Swiss-Prot record:
Residues 354-394, 395-434, 698-737 form the EGF-like domain. This is Low-density lipoprotein receptor-related protein 4. LDL-receptor class B repeats lie at residues 480-522, 523-565, 566-609, 610-652, 653-693, 785-827, 828-870, 871-914, 915-956, 957-998, 1093-1135, 1136-1178, 1179-1222, 1223-1263, 1264-1306, 1397-1439, 1440-1482, 1483-1526, 1527-1568, 1569-1610. GO terms for cellular component: cell surface; dendrite; neuromuscular junction; neuronal cell body; plasma membrane; plasma membrane raft; postsynaptic density; synapse.
Length: 1905
């Protein structure tokens, strides 16, 4: 409809009945007056608009009585005067533009397989409800919402997603509803030692850290790297390690992920046609203020006065001045626009015919004639255009207009015809094509998963999850397969389209596979790799892999195939960005585009449209071109921050964007109709449209027999080519060789590669091996086609066939740095050097029968080679004295052959023909050779090699690898000349060999029955040519051929990171690592159970005690909590117990061998206990104490009869052992540097060995003592009787700790507890007089002295950073026991629910509230979002509610105990709320607030009737607890350093304890007050009545936080909410005299009632399978009381009130404003109603003022301050002032942040607490006697006149007196008790110790503050 011009309404009169009368309308002379409307409106239009065929008046009055133009007899006359062809009548198209040609048409009957549209069209039935508007009027998409299955979650918008996507951290619903109200996710477990943890928690191999690749997906693995892999020439290295084009530096675009390419740049200058963004980037000036954020910082859209462009209807013309006129008024000779923009010369108007009318000769017009303003105007039929003469008509070629037809177009005279390719069908609009088949699905990689989404429905499903870093993607529709590449794993994988059967396709030789494409016709897989700069091809299963293109490739990225044309297309964004193409066999390579490209990412082909589309992330553009590169055009050039991948389907483009994390779509022709398909994705990468028509059928050039090819058949144009896998030679035109006979084999750390000598290109390919992390040494055995390699990352030696099959680990234990490897192909032996252990070892080629050959005088041995003909082996050693040595292959006849002019002798090689030894020296930069005995030394290549490493010989050539040039080179082996480079740009080159089949045969006696050896037969230079030997630690018997069965006597010792054994059965000492597959970080103490053959050890870093079999199997942790520094450990093999000392906790404990029934034996007067030994037969245990007063002690093995044996002349008593044969005690002292001995009672003490440098562990076996020494890093031995004959057992062992000597042949002693555990229910422990029964820590032994209680009854529960512990109050030891709750990080507050036995706690590191059972099971997150710093927590055990304070958000909230029904109770006038406590029986809620105005407040449990109890003389009120018996509150003040109490009304305030250091939390039980103290790191207690009898319950505990008491007497009582939740549907809150029902802040989908017992009806009817609608957050809290009747309201969904609810009085209809008709006046009744309303309000106010005046007579004078707040009100005894004097400087300095910690340095550990927790330096000064304070509970009172005051206190605290009565009684006795100050504050006395905060102590006077 045209805009309305002229006057609209002159006026209207108002009457009492609201009826308007109209005036006569009169327009000017130049205007036409339209008919008066029913509303009395007058409309004037320009006179020239009359009789122009347009309904300008709106009622056709301007067209009534007009003569319409005539139509020819062949045409149809439309109602609006338009003439159309009669054949167009009733064809379903609105050709008249007023639908008159489609009126009164007989209805068309649709076929059975068609759907009838409402506009009369018929479409295919399968198009109904497919998401496409096929009818044109959207009637085919008016569909019922699809029902979600049982395994799906329905989003709020109705779409369905997988059920397990709910609350998974990813926004899968388009509206984000799947991530609302979710518990917090459990943090990712920490990575192990060999892994690196990415910023978002994922673990990758540590070798990927700082390797230049984005393995994490967010570049966090490449940040903070001290050294980066260098970028290529022409590239710029970002700070994160990413390499980009150097031309992108300082260009205004942040191309680096960390924006480092735009730092320190001079201001860029933009041209006159460009706009400079705030970031410095230049964009087109025309993009300024166009509504699109082209700058990416929105600076091009700022300060735009009018960003919206005027819009006109499709049949209108937009004038330059913004007016809209009808298209018919163009070029009519009249200035309709008013600015002449509709006429010449602004418009190309046709000349007029000059005829007077259309009745004569059709006005001179060739087709149509019409009279316009009295003149003839010619027009043409649809399909024609008027020519220059203004008379004749010319055919319009619609096919020339791009996008006029979706696919094919045929032009006809006056018309056109669109047609579609096979597989498509023309839509009813006759122009667009719709693909036949199933509904299209967008398949995209999301880094961590692969998902699919329906583009028109928002249906979103998961295909594959738990991926590492999925980038590229493609599918094979016919075979129902999906393929993807993972750039973290460097692999290509595939799976079925249903997500099943995941398997690896290509697992080796990949570095950065960024592009992937499937040839669905010939079943081939193509991919690009920007790391290797290659394009490769293979079968769909990865077989027959071939490097297709590798020359002149830099960084190939996207790839697309056209199998029907046999063409491959790819993008390359190296230094010369381009798009290229070639045949699919690699031939016919050509450039498609190489200009105006920077970062061409995505690439796709429109097969039906015969075009290609690509995205450029640098230019922020989507472009298209023909397949030959012609007709290139930008489709979208703005609003594209970082497009990555693109796909096309039908007429739409779909692309992913990294910056917006979204999938978008637009029209493929125009770029218009842009739409966000999905956003808030994790990291969208590649994308494809999953549909059969995206892979149309094509001719398979290879046919059914693979083209007759033996391996690969690759299409090439319209033909094909047979090709061979890389390295295999072609025998003829169709066949390839089946094997490789000779090839160059080299290691490249991450893979092992080969270069075939059978082909001319010498391109390398990867042997497909798994899990190669850091390969160094290589060798091979052609007899079984095996390749062997060492890996210094996994510390393994492995082997596989040369084709990668049969891979297996050969040696995987006791390796540290296997640097050299050699195969004896004669005896099938494997030799290797280990630079970490400094050994040369040998084993069978399968790794069995391993033994140490040489272990002495080795210093970093490197390469090794063998010469079986002579029986010698040769190795290089490049330690402090570099040398080359040789020895017999059985270790005999060892000698140094080269020792001078060597620096880093690396690779070795033997020329068996000329008997020469070659070596490469990286320090000397030479390659040299000499005779096998070291003679005739000569330099082959000197001072010309940057860094040679690996070396090998073959034929007449020598080959070597070079680290610095990253190349493989060769030269003549005799002269060193004729050098050539075989391969370059190869990172991390290591060893090199040539695999061939011409090794010389050698005869040996070992080939005949193994030479008669029982185990190993080795070649030797001795006359027999061989010798027998045994595996390490096993003795060779006298026959020289047979080995003993195993170790009987051995040493076992801890070396921090492993446990090792040294056999004592053999004449030499060699340590063997116990192959325990567990992480060890700081293994200290060790013990052995010879009965079961198990070793036990403690790890003081991991804080655990573990055990395993001596062969490394059956490993397990037995103690994982409550350990700090377990320095000593002893196994009672007879009594089946394990004992240990803990220097951190100063305890000695015992437990069963599996860690159960743990008990603290000794805990008093211990100061760093260390070593411990047992004497079960005597019932004694002995230990050393390393503290300030070092000593040796003894007690019974049950902790009884404790005695100090020696306490003088001791320094650091470390190791300890008992000699049972001589009844002596031996110990090692690292300070006195002596090993001493004494009798078992401490007598006859004397020195045995002196000096010893730093002995640690000590043990004894037979006649010798053995000890470890930190200083010498060795194990020593001496005679146990004399201390003489000291020898070195093993050296070069850093990290030596404890040691034990074991003889498994020795018999065990008698078990004192017998076979029935002494009749004890739990522990039976030996003692000198027999045994005693004992219970686990904290549990009492019953009266029978045999049986234990099941669990403690009353105990303290407290938090300490990463732990929750308990202390039993039933026993006297008061030792803490860890509650085994997993995943604790920084626990602050906690509480307990005695009903279900669960502990609730807050973790401020994770910002969650969780709960768990006391045994650590059933841990779950209760509140997982919307928290900042939850410092206080309280459980309402009656109403089953949970309360908490949030210091970060300054709120107090509540929920059900399961976290549901969450509601904010108080969120105003809070400033750092801290502790919180509830009194369910009274309906009270208490909390502390220590913001600028510290205070303690109280409210009802619903937050109402808020009252400030105390706000004077407060500093930092931390902890808060209630004494439910005496009805008093207790709190600790960390600023004033005291503990105080008051009654429940804040009256009768008393200081209980002063001069406490830094109290944090407190609790109460019986007559005791317990509190935690940060400064003293202890839990203490005092008498709650007197404040005396102060005791330390637990000391030396870091990070103490909250503390509570769990007792049957603690959580008692009930209230109205205790029965059936008070009848409430959601929340029930008890109050002082009533209770209320309340609704959560966020609706949970269930109707909420505020009336007890009433369940409101659903707001609308729903089907059984349909979920109820979500209720809005509009439900207030409503009071329910037996004495008060309150009107209630209930709102339904969407805020609507049903009629039934309104009739019940549950709610009221909202007053919706109804807009009046134009010109209608206000009704008089409205004014009267308004006056009555005002009068009513005044009456209410007057009544309220009168009521308050009367009420003030009976209330406390201080309660006059009533402050209204929402949602409730609070009353305050005193006015709350927001301004206060600033706290002293120490306040700010000691304010706790989340990053702080309660220690002096504030940097040791990170505690996540926000300004709600304070740390105050203080001393342990004595607290005063509080002389001014007296209590009636503490004894007789000196002044009996104060007895009444105390009586008032008791009555008030019990609740029998209200506030007014209490105040009156206190005032009566004020004069009598004036000398008693119940809130006195004693003065501090004494000086403060130096704690590190001495000069920042709290100010002592108010004036200083």
């Amino acid at each position: 409809m045209r805009r309305w011009w002229g006057a609209l309404l002159l006026g209207a009169l108002l009457c009492a009945h609201g009826i308007a009368s109209s005036l006569e309308c009169a327009c000017g002379r130049s205007h036409f007056t339209c008919a008066v409307s029913a509303l009395g409106e007058c409309t004037c239009i320009p006179a020239q608009w009359q009789c122009d065929g347009d309904n300008d008046c709106g009622d056709h009055s301007d067209e009534d009585g007009c003569t319409l133009p005539t139509c020819s007899p062949l045409d149809f006359h439309c109602d609006n005067g338009k003439c159309i062809r009669r054949s167009w009548v009733c064809d379903g198209d609105n050709d008249c533009e007023d639908d008159s040609d489609e009126q009164d048409c007989p209805p068309r009957e649709c076929e059975e397989d068609e759907f009838p549209c409402q506009n009369g069209y018929c479409i295919r039935s399968l198009w109904h409800c497919d998401g496409d508007n096929d009818c044109g009027d959207n009637s085919d998409e008016q569909c019922d919402m699809r029902k979600c299955s049982d395994k799906e979650f329905r989003c709020s918008d109705g779409s369905c997603i997988a059920e397990h996507w709910y609350c998974d951290g990813d926004t899968d619903c388009k509206d984000g509803s799947d991530e609302e109200s979710c518990p917090s996710a459990v943090p990712s477990p920490p990575c192990n030692l060999e892994e690196f943890q990415c910023a978002y928690g994922r673990c990758i191999l540590d070798i990927y850290h700082c390797d230049g690749d984005d393995d994490c997906g967010d570049w966090s693995d490449e940040s903070d790297c001290s050294s980066h892999q260098p970028c290529r020439s022409g590239e710029f290295m970002c700070d994160s390690g990413l390499c980009i084009n150097s031309g992108w530096r300082c260009d205004g675009d942040a191309d680096c992920d960390d924006q480092s390419d735009e730092r320190n740049c001079t201001t860029s200058m933009c041209t006159a046609e460009q706009f400079r963004c705030r970031s410095g980037r230049c964009v087109r000036l025309s993009w300024r203020c166009d509504g699109e954020d082209d700058c990416a910082d929105n600076s091009d859209e700022e300060n735009c006065e009018n960003t919206g462009s005027p819009q006109c209807a499709s049949d209108q013309f937009l004038c330059w001045n913004g007016r809209c006129i009808g298209q018919r008024k163009l070029c009519n000779g009249i200035n309709d626009c008013g600015d002449s923009s509709d006429e010449s010369p602004q418009q190309n108007c046709r000349p007029r015919t000059g005829e007077e009318n259309c009745n004569v000769n059709n006005g001179g017009c060739a087709q149509k004639c019409q009279m316009v303003r009295g003149a003839v105007q010619c027009t043409c039929h649809t399909g024609y255009r008027l020519t220059e003469d203004g008379r004749t008509c010319q055919d319009v070629n619609e096919c020339a207009e791009e996008g006029y037809c979706s696919q094919g177009c045929t032009n006809t005279e006056g018309a056109f015809q669109c047609w579609c390719e096979a597989g498509y069908e023309l839509r009813p609009d006759r122009r667009s094509c719709k693909a036949l088949g199933p509904e299209p699905v967008l398949l995209f990689a999301n880094r961590i998963d692969i998902r699919q989404v329906l583009p028109h429905r928002s249906e979103y499903t998961l295909l594959l999850n738990n991926l590492e870093n999925a980038i590229a993607l493609d599918f094979h529709h016919r075979r129902e397969l999906v393929f993807w590449s993972d750039v973290t794993l460097d692999r290509i994988l595939r799976a079925n389209l249903n997500g099943s059967n995941v398997e690896e396709v290509v697992s080796t030789g990949l570095e950065s596979p960024g592009g992937l494409a499937v040839d669905w016709v010939h079943d081939k897989l193509y991919w690009t790799d920007s790391g290797t700069s290659r394009i490769e091809v293979a079968n769909l299963d990865g077989a027959h892999r071939k490097v297709l293109l590798w020359q002149s490739l830099e960084k190939p990225r996207a790839i697309a195939l056209h199998p029907m044309e046999g063409t491959i297309y790819w993008t390359d964004w190296g230094n010369t960005p381009r798009i290229e193409a070639s045949s699919m066999d690699g031939s016919g390579r050509r450039i498609i585009a190489d200009t105006h490209l920077f970062w061409p990412n995505g690439l796709t082909i429109d097969y039906a449209g015969r075009r290609m589309y690509w995205v450029d992330a640098k230019h922020h553009v989507i472009e298209r071109a023909n397949l030959d590169g012609s007709h290139r055009k930008a489709v979208i050039s703005q609003g594209l921050p970082h497009p990555f991948a693109i796909t096309v389907f039908e007429d739409s483009l779909y692309w992913t964007d990294w910056h917006t994390k979204s999938i978008n779509s637009a029209n493929k022709f125009t770029g218009k109709n842009q739409e966000i398909i999905r956003n808030k994705l994790h990291f969208p990468m590649d994308i494809h449209t999953l549909h059969p028509q995206r892979q149309p059928a094509g001719k398979n050039r290879c046919g059914d027999n693979n083209g007759g090819c033996t391996h690969l058949c690759l299409p090439s144009g319209q033909n094909y080519t047979c090709a061979c896998p890389t390295g295999f030679r072609k025998i003829n035109s169709h066949a390839c060789a089946q094997s490789l006979d000779k090839f160059l084999l080299f290691a490249r750390r991450m893979d092992i590669r080969r270069i075939s000598f059978d082909t001319e290109d010498l391109s390398d390919d990867v042997i497909p091996l798994a899990d190669v992390r850091s390969a160094v040494a290589l060798d091979w055995d052609s007899r079984d086609d095996h390749v062997y390699w060492t890996d210094v990352s996994t510390d393994t030696i492995s082997r596989a066939k040369w084709d990668g099959t049969g891979q297996e680990v050969v040696v995987d234990t006791s390796l540290e740095s296997p640097a050299g490897l050699a195969i004896d192909w004669v005896t099938n032996k494997l030799y290797w050097t280990d630079a970490g252990t400094d050994r040369i070892e040998v084993a069978n080629t399968d790794g069995s029968m391993r033994t140490v050959l040489i272990w002495e005088n080795l210093d970093r041995p490197r390469d090794i080679v063998v010469e079986p003909m002579g029986g010698y082996m040769y190795w290089t050693d490049w330690g402090a004295s570099p040398k080359i040595e040789r020895a017999g292959m059985d270790a005999s006849s060892r000698q140094v052959i080269i020792s001078s002019n060597l620096t880093w002798p690396n690779g070795l090689a033997i020329d068996y023909g000329s008997q020469r030894l070659y070596w490469a020296d990286a320090g000397m930069k030479t390659i040299e050779f000499a005779g096998l005995d070291g003679s005739k030394r000569k330099v082959l290549i000197g001072s010309q090699l940057p860094h040679p490493f690996g070396l090998t010989l073959y034929g007449q050539r020598i080959y070597w690898t070079d680290w610095q040039t990253k190349s493989i080179q060769s030269a003549d082996r005799l002269t060193g000349l004729d050098r050539e480079t075989l391969q370059e740009n190869l990172e991390n080159l290591m060893d090199i060999h040539v695999f061939h089949r011409q090794r010389p045969p050698v005869t040996t006696l070992c080939a005949v029955e193994n030479g008669g050896c029982s185990h190993l037969c080795l070649r030797s230079p001795n006359p027999s040519g061989f010798s027998c030997t045994c595996p390490t630690g096993i003795n060779l018997l006298r026959d020289g051929k047979t080995c003993s069965p195993g170790m009987n006597s051995f040493l076992i010792f801890a070396r921090r990171i492993d446990v090792r054994m040294v056999s004592l059965d053999i004449p030499y000492f060699a340590d063997v690592v116990v192959p325990i597959n567990m992480t060890m970080k700081n293994t200290i103490a060790i013990g052995v159970d010879p009965l079961e053959g198990k070793v036990y050890w403690s790890d003081s870093t991991l804080h655990r005690i573990s055990r395993a079999s001596l062969d490394g199997s059956q490993h397990e942790d037995i103690i994982t909590t409550g350990l700090q520094t377990t320095d000593g450990l002893a196994v009672d093999a007879i009594g089946r117990k394990v004992y240990w000392t803990d220097t951190g906790t100063n305890r000695i404990e015992v437990g069963n061998l599996d860690g159960s029934m743990r008990k603290v034996l000794v805990w008093q007067n211990l100061d760093s206990p260390r070593a411990i030994v047992l004497y079960h037969e005597m019932g004694f245990m002995y230990w050393t104490d390393w503290g300030e007063n070092a000593k040796l002690e003894r007690s019974g093995m049950d902790g009884s009869d404790r005695t100090v044996l020696i306490n003088n002349n001791l320094g650091w008593p470390n190791g300890l052992t008992v000699d049972k044969t001589s009844s002596q005690l031996l110990w090692a002292d690292a300070h006195t540097e002596r090993i001493e001995v004494a009798d078992l009672n401490g007598a006859n003490r004397h020195t045995l060995v002196s000096p010893v440098q730093h002995p640690y562990g000590l043990t004894l076996l037979d006649s010798y003592i053995y000890w470890t020494d930190w200083q010498t890093r060795s194990i020593h031995r001496a005679d146990k009787s004399t201390g003489s004959n000291v020898i070195l057992v093993r050296s070069n062992l850093p990290g030596l700790m404890d040691i034990q000597a074991v003889d498994r042949a020795q018999p065990l002693g008698f078990n004192k507890c017998g076979s029935r555990n002494g009749g004890c229910s739990h522990l039976c422990l030996p003692r000198p007089s027999g045994f005693s029964c004992a219970c686990p820590t904290g549990i009492q032994l019953k009266g029978d002295r045999k049986t234990c209680d099941p669990s403690p009854e009353t105990y303290l529960l407290f938090s300490s950073r990463g732990s929750i512990r308990r202390i039993s109050l039933d026993t006297d030891d008061h030792t803490d026991v860890h509650v085994p709750v997993p995943g604790l990080n920084n626990v602050i507050s906690l509480d307990y629910d005695s009903v279900h036995g669960k502990v609730y706690y807050t973790d401020v590191f994770l910002d969650v509230i969780r709960r768990a059972d006391l045994n650590g099971s059933n841990m779950e997150t209760v509140i997982g979002h919307g928290l900042k710093t939850t410092d206080g927590l309280a459980v309402d055990w009656v109403a089953r509610n949970l309360y908490w304070t949030d210091t970060g958000r300054n709120t107090i909230e509540a929920s059900r105990l399961d976290g549901s029904c969450r509601k904010v109770l108080i969120n105003n006038s809070l400033d750092e709320p801290r502790a919180i406590a509830v009194f369910p029986r009274k309906g009270y809620l208490f909390w502390t607030d220590w913001g600028h105005i510290a205070k303690i407040e109280r409210a009802n449990l619903d937050g109402s009737e808020r009252k400030v109890l105390i706000n004077t003389d407060l500093g930092w009120p931390n902890g808060l607890t209630l004494d439910y018996d005496t009805r008093r509150i207790y709190w600790v003040d960390a600023h004033l350093d005291r503990i105080e109490s008051a009654d429940l009304n804040g009256k009768l305030r008393q200081v209980l304890v002063s001069h406490v250091s830094h109290p944090f939390a407190l609790t109460q039980q019986d007559r005791w007050i317990y509190w935690t103290d940060w400064q003293t790191k202890s839990i203490q207690r005092v008498d709650k009545y007197s404040g005396r009898n102060k005791e330390t319950v637990l000391a030396n505990v870091e990070g103490l936080m909250d503390i509570i008491v769990v007792s049957p007497q603690r959580q008692t009582g009930t209230n109205a909410c205790g029965v059936n939740n008070g009848g409430c549907t959601h929340l029930c809150f008890a109050r002082a005299s009533d209770f209320v029902c309340a609704c959560p802040d966020e609706p949970d989908g269930h109707p909420c009632s505020l009336v007890p017992g009433l369940v409101p009806p659903a707001p609308r009817a729903t089907s059984m399978n349909e979920k109820s609608p979500v209720l809005p957050n509009t439900l207030p809290t409503t009071l329910h009381s037996s004495t008060t009747k309150t009107r209630t309201s209930l709102e339904g969904a969407g805020g609507r009130c049903s009629e039934r609810d309104a009739q019940l009085g549950l709610c009221a209809h909202s007053n919706e404003a109804v807009p009046a008709a134009p010109g209608e006046g206000l009704h008089v009744s409205y004014a009267i109603g308004g006056l009555l309303s005002i009068l009513l309000i005044l009456l209410v106010i007057a009544a309220l003022m009168l009521y308050r005046h009367r009420k003030s007579k009976f209330t406390d004078p201080g309660m006059g301050n009533l402050t209204y707040s929402n949602p409730s009100y609070r009353t305050s005894t005193q006015e709350v002032k927001l301004e206060a004097a600033p706290k002293p400087a120490v306040y700010n300095q000691l304010c706790y942040k989340k990053e702080g910690g309660p220690d002096h340095s504030y940097t040791k550990e990170k505690i996540k607490i926000v300004e709600g927790i304070r740390l105050l330096a203080g001393d342990d000064a004595e607290w005063g006697d509080l002389k001014q304070l007296r209590s009636s509970r503490g004894g007789l009172l000196r002044d009996h006149v104060c007895m009444k005051t105390d009586t008032v206190s008791i009555q008030a605290s019990s609740g029998s007196l209200d506030d007014t009565e209490t105040e009156q009684l206190l005032q009566e006795e004020q004069s009598e008790c004036s000398s008693v100050h119940t809130a006195a504050t004693p003065e501090r006395r004494g000086s403060l110790p130096d704690t590190g905060w001495k000069h920042e102590r709290k100010l002592s006077s108010e004036s200083q503050v």
